[in-house]
């Protein structure tokens, strides 16, 4: 079972990445959460795989992630996509990735590097080293959308699950884990402080792009 990452923890992870001069990773974490990406899919992304409003040939107010080597390629489409609806995620993508060349990678490393960074981040936040893993971004994003009222059928499309029955079981378990999860007081305090940092950063970023 992949422990779903709650939104407050996502924010904490993003602040850690920003504070260590890894802005691209902070955006990648937000994108993985919002678009229900698998860790391997995140690490293989290049700039050409993310379409953003204002890009040449792209005439839409939303963005899109194109996944060229999906896990479910044998039973579904060989090239898949997820639409980026979230305004702040789009803003972050524009700010950090807008001027990258088409074949520039969006991840600072491979999946092992991402897993290692997660272990460091967990300890830095006052959690157990392996309490949450990169796979928890997909689980957390799906659970967050489900609790916000997103129909299971929509989640299946966005998350590209092969079977509806599998997704229903997955979301049911994730929601239960998230509801019963408790974090030590030190982690809760740090996440509260980091939330304030991220709110200020996003407010400043939003103002600069208006």
State what each model feature region is.
Residues 1-210:
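Extended, non-catalytic subsegments within catalytic or DNA/protein-binding/adaptor domains
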């Amino acid at each position: 079972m992949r422990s779903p990452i709650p939104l407050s923890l996502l924010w904490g992870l993003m602040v850690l990445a920003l504070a260590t001069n890894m802005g691209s990773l902070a955006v990648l974490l937000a994108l993985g959460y919002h678009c229900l990406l698998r860790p391997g899919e995140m690490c293989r992304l290049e700039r050409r795989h993310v379409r953003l409003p204002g890009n040449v040939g792209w005439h839409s107010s939303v963005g899109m992630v194109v996944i060229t080597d999906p896990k479910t390629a044998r039973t579904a489409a060989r090239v898949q996509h997820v639409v980026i609806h979230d305004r702040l995620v789009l803003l972050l993508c524009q700010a950090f990735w807008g001027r990258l060349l088409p074949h520039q990678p969006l991840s600072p490393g491979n999946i092992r590097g991402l897993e290692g960074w997660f272990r460091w981040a967990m300890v830095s936040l006052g959690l157990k080293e392996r309490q949450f893993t990169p796979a928890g971004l997909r689980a957390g994003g799906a659970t967050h959308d489900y609790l916000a009222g997103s129909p299971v059928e929509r989640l299946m499309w966005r998350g590209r699950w092969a079977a509806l029955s599998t997704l229903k079981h997955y979301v049911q378990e994730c929601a239960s884990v998230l509801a019963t999860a408790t974090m030590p007081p030190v982690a809760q305090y740090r996440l509260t402080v980091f939330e304030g940092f991220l709110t200020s950063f996003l407010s400043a970023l939003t103002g600069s792009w208006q």
